[in-house]
Every structure is written in structure tokens, then in C-alpha cells.
């Protein structure tokens, strides 16, 4: 078993200076949502992909701190004992397949009890960072990126924090399980895909292999969607999401530029994707 124990003090100071009641409440709410996901949604994903099982949970409050404990099954003991910081494009395939299965399983699912907008970086969660951003295209088009993603008619549940560190791998790397569902909620699949690839591939691999990774993800997604949607709707979902991949990247770029403008993830690929997104939302 794994015990995830969260203690929230009455006050908190973020190392980058982003401390506010808004951020404090958002962080605590993320743990409540994770508990809700494991209780109500994780069982619906059984047979589609691997994740931990919630054994029990408990919450306690006092004047100085709030505590929440989640007792989860041990993924290491289940054969997912390996973690990675960087992968080749080919080694990303098991995670892309997991994401495709997750997005297909919850296509058109209302995010009841979860974040209405999944992810920790969407515009509504970052008013302080956005207000302090330097003037420029990212600030100018930030609201348009957000609106474009929200208005996509083909919505699903997204993991919301699908970095490589939140995936556990089998010894041969061919099977994965996901953890940390604090920011699960409504969205479109390429938000997870863009975030994952940006977390795991080198800048050169992003430039050289992003299209190959997207091809693989969309093959897996189409296959999974075809079991529950009509062929024309499968095509519509895949075409819509693929077109919005650049917007998902640009939206994350907007977050990074406000939160940590010197971040290493602001690379040539992210900048290229942002230029494409600006052209798309300006058309």
C-alpha cells in the first residue's frame, strides 16, 4: 500500500512567490478532486488502462492544519516499478496509448465532481501570473487560446498533469500506469499529449519526432473511439484535436511565460507551435 498524506497549514509561501488564498484553495481542492476521481471515475477505467486503486481515505480538520490521507494500492508491487525522466520517441508509445485509451473512455463525459477545466495551467487558474506577464503576443492571444480550447465540441476528461514523472513503467517499458490525478477534469486530449511530450522529449526530438508521436496517438485514439462512436464522429474528434495541438502548446507557453519566463521548456518547438496557434486563432 501507498499512503498519500496531505497536510495544509493555514498559511503557505510559494518558493517562486506565487502565494495567495486563490492558489492555496486551488491546491487543497486538487487533493479533494483526486480523492473523488479515485472513488467515482477510476473504476470506470478498469480494463482500459492501469492506475492505482483507492483502498480508503480520511480527512481531518483543526485550527492550524487540514489533513487528507489517501491509501492506494502499490503500483511497484503490481509490476510498474520503473520511473523515467526522458525517453526516446519510440519509448513514449505506451504512455501515448494510455492517454488515448483514457481520452476515448471518457469522451463526452461531463466532469461532475472534477475540475470543469482540467490541468493546473489554464488561464482561469493563473490570474496573478497573467496580470504580471510582459505585454506581447502571448498575453494578447492568451484569452483566445483558452477560448478556442474550451469551445471545442469534442471534450473528454484529461489527466491534467501528464508529465512523464506521473507514469510508472514496467521493466520492459511496454506497460504503464498513471498516478497523481489532482488536476483531472474537462478538456481535449491534446492538452495531455502536448504536456507529456514537452516533459519527456529533448528539444531536438520534439522537432524531429512530434508528428510521428501524434500519428501514433491518433491511431490509438481512433481505434479506441471506434468502439463507441460512429466512424464520422471518430474522424471529427481526431481532426479537431489534431488541429488544436498547436493551441494546446501555446496555452502552456502562456502559462510558462507568466510563471517562469526563463523556463527550459520554452524552446524552439514551443515557440513554433505558438506561432501556428496565433495564426489559427487570428484567421
Language-model features, listed with the residues they occupy:
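Short mixed-charge
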Residues: 222-239
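Active-site activation/catalytic loop segments of kinase-like enzymes and analogous catalytic loops
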Residues: 23, 36, 186-226, 248-268
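Conserved ATP-binding subdomain of kinase catalytic cores across diverse folds
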Residues: 1-118
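Active-site acidic catalytic loop and adjacent metal/ATP-binding pocket
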Residues: 1-2, 145-189
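Secondary-structure capping and boundary motifs in well-ordered enzyme cores
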Residues: 64, 91, 154, 158-159, ...
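Regulatory N- and C-terminal appendages and interdomain linkers associated
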Residues: 235-283
Amino acid at each position: 500500500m501507498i499512503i498519500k498524506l496531505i497536510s495544509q497549514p493555514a498559511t503557505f509561501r510559494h518558493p517562486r512567490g506565487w502565494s495567495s488564498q486563490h492558489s492555496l484553495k486551488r491546491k487543497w481542492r486538487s487533493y479533494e478532486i483526486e480523492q473523488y476521481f479515485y472513488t467515482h471515475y477510476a473504476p470506470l477505467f478498469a480494463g482500459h488502462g492501469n492506475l492505482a486503486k483507492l483502498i480508503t481515505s480520511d480527512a481531518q480538520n483543526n485550527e492550524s492544519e487540514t489533513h487528507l490521507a489517501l491509501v492506494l494500492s502499490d503500483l511497484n508491487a503490481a509490476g510498474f516499478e520503473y520511473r523515467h525522466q526522458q525517453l526516446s520517441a519510440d519509448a513514449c508509445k505506451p504512455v501515448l496509448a494510455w492517454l488515448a485509451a483514457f481520452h476515448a473512455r471518457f469522451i463526452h463525459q461531463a466532469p461532475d465532481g472534477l475540475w470543469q477545466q482540467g490541468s493546473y495551467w489554464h488561464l482561469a487558474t493563473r490570474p496573478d501570473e497573467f496580470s504580471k506577464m510582459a505585454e506581447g503576443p502571448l498575453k494578447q492571444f492568451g484569452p483566445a487560446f483558452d477560448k478556442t480550447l474550451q469551445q471545442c465540441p469534442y471534450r473528454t476528461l484529461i489527466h491534467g498533469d501528464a508529465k512523464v514523472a506521473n507514469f510508472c513503467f514496467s521493466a520492459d517499458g511496454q506497460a504503464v500506469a498513471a498516478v497523481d490525478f489532482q488536476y483531472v477534469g474537462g478538456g481535449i486530449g491534446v492538452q495531455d499529449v502536448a504536456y507529456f511530450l514537452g516533459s519527456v522529449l529533448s528539444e531536438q526530438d520534439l522537432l524531429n519526432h512530434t508528428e510521428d508521436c501524434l500519428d501514433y496517438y491518433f491511431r490509438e485514439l481512433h481505434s479506441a473511439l471506434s468502439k463507441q462512436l460512429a466512424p464520422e464522429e471518430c474522424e471529427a474528434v481526431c481532426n479537431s484535436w489534431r488541429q488544436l495541438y498547436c493551441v494546446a502548446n501555446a496555452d502552456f507557453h502562456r502559462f510558462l511565460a507568466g510563471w517562469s519566463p526563463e523556463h527550459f521548456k520554452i524552446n524552439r518547438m514551443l515557440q513554433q507551435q505558438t506561432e501556428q496557434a496565433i495564426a489559427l486563432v487570428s484567421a
